[in-house]
Amino acid sequence: MEPRIASTVRTTRETDIQIRLDLDGTGRVQAETGVPFLDHMLAQIATHGLIDIDVSAQGDLHIDDHHTNEDVGIAFGQCLAKALGDKRGISRFGHFAAPLDEALVQVVLDLSGRPHLSYGLEIPTQRVGSYDTQLVREFYQAVVNNSSMTLHLRQWAGINSHHIIEASFKAFARALRLAVEIDPRRAGSLPSSKGAL
């Protein structure tokens, strides 16, 4: 099997982002986005998804974190799609429910080629530290749009904002890990009855 490694550069008037993903990694992460909470969440994806992630970003943080947060999501989604290639042999679907203390979040995803986000997180506070919790949805939407995945997030329990968000990223990581794994029984075929994704 060829290495499933990809790099993406995104440069706009608002941000300059470089990202590299290795889908068959060991969970190594180097995240320097200038948004500490986002770095922490990217570390969850790497650690629990066993995806090596290298990302650096310079953005207009003097305005707020929105552009950097969204553009990192865009670059992540584009890089994921590139690393997956034609998707031959992948499992395609993934689901996982992750607890973090009182919080419980379930993620179900399909690397279908059809972008759709069903967002069911109810985060009770506007901020976690300096991070605007509205940006969680913006990150996931950017990933979905640019990787063309279907993503459902459901919160079954949780009262602490940090716990809810982190549980969602851990569940996303584990679901993504299941979906990108190569199924040897597929023998390199596409996981679709249509023969196309």
From Swiss-Prot:
It catalyses: D-erythro-1-(imidazol-4-yl)glycerol 3-phosphate = 3-(imidazol-4-yl)-2-oxopropyl phosphate + H2O. Its EC number is 4.2.1.19. It comes from the Bacteria. GO terms for molecular function: imidazoleglycerol-phosphate dehydratase activity. It is found in: Cytoplasm. Keywords: Amino-acid biosynthesis, Cytoplasm, Histidine biosynthesis, Lyase. Its main location: cytoplasm. Coiled coil: none annotated. One of its GO terms (biological process) is L-histidine biosynthetic process. The keyword Lyase applies. SUPFAM superfamilies: Ribosomal protein S5 domain 2-like. The keyword Oxidoreductase does not apply. GO terms for cellular component: cytoplasm. Pathway: Amino-acid biosynthesis; L-histidine biosynthesis; L-histidine from 5-phospho-alpha-D-ribose 1-diphosphate: step 6/9. Belongs to the imidazoleglycerol-phosphate dehydratase family. This is Imidazoleglycerol-phosphate dehydratase. It comes from Gloeobacter violaceus (strain ATCC 29082 / PCC 7421). The gene is hisB.
